[in-house]
Amino acid sequence: LFHRLVNLYNQTEGKIVFTCNSKILANDIKMRLPKFLDQMKVSRREDIDERIKVMRSWGSRLKPESGLYSYICNYYGLDFINYTMSGVEGFDGVCLSAISQLEDKKNNSDLPYCFDYVLIDEAQDFSDSFFKLCEMVTSNQVIVASDIFQKIYERKSNLVEKPDFTLNKVYRTDPKNFMFSQFLGFGLKEKPVIQWFDRDEDWQFSGYSFENRDTEEGLIYEFSREPINRFNDINSYEIIPTKIYYKPDTFNIVKQVIEIIDELREEHSDISPSDIGIVFVSKSNEGYKLADNISTIIEQKYNWETQKVYEEKYKSRENSKVFISNQNNVKGLEFSFLIGIVLDEITQDLESRNTIYMLMTRSFLTSYLILGDSNKDIYDKYKPMLEEILSTGKASILKPGKEDILQEEQIKDLIGSSLTLDQKIEKALKNKNRFSSDNIDKLKIMIKTLKKNKVMS
């Protein structure tokens, strides 16, 4: 998308907007764009602030240029709907409302365009209503880029499922790391399997080669991905792209993180704090306590600053610090080395599965996956698969029977059961169109009172 943006800037006089769902990704893109323009030797930039805008998708009514939707509402005088008032339909409903208002205006008068080109990154996060809204306000072209596998169990958009062009090679991370991370996300070593493509061409479409062989157990698929020489100055054979650990308690998890950093500092003399990202997957306070502990040790032992991005209002990545985050702030970011820590049991947790796939594919060189006490079974199932991938470049997977693949209704049930209390409260209130901060607080107090009365009785 950056290459396309530069071409549009150089070859046209049009107004261009680059958008995505995540605030931290939008801020990261703003910081990376000037460096990319330098690399592409773009010298004429006097009108760049007028012609190129980078913003997240939603935004704020008080800051119209903070988001594409808020910009559109301000430009055309539409009713702005914030998150609290969005109801059960969320951003999809917000976009549908804006579309309806624009259609009314279009019927009464000519509707001017506010952009010539819109570039949408991480498009798998959006439904088709957002794409239609962008088309209505764009004179020339809406360009959509997505990773269809960042949602391993559902798709929001028909447009994203039917792309004009497909890039089935992965350049950011090693193909072996990608295959391991995706197969862990798909649950291919478990029963039931979360995702399986019935048509062989769908595996090929996704960049996989495979051979089949019959065994007593059933039909075995031997998957592989084409190796890619991503770095001219690094011998890729010296790099282990994926490492997995099982640690039964937080003490040993912290110890393992420090051992990894020690090893990286020893092997890479020019390593900087910003080369390392640490992400924990936990729906409880245990993850934040662990992150505080890791942050303190890093700052004391290495004299490196850390950035716990979830504590910051503006969520902009700082290049001089070790990045530490929960699962909510890693989309679109890239690191030389990524350390993922999984505290929650993920066997039945599809959201966490999705997060693990996403965070594990953030690394240029190596991703480290540390599994906590509740995931010993996952470690035992996937450690042998990783060893096979690293040694042979292949993964042998038994084709599951139809009864061993999760069906749509089962997936919906699992998604619902994996929600936190706060998420369940939010969903319930949105379903009743009663979502507000006051109602959230009231419902929490009510639940707390009911639990207390139950204990007393």
Model-predicted regions and their roles:
Residues L1-S457:
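The feature marks helicase ATPase cores and/or their adjacent C-terminal helical subdomains
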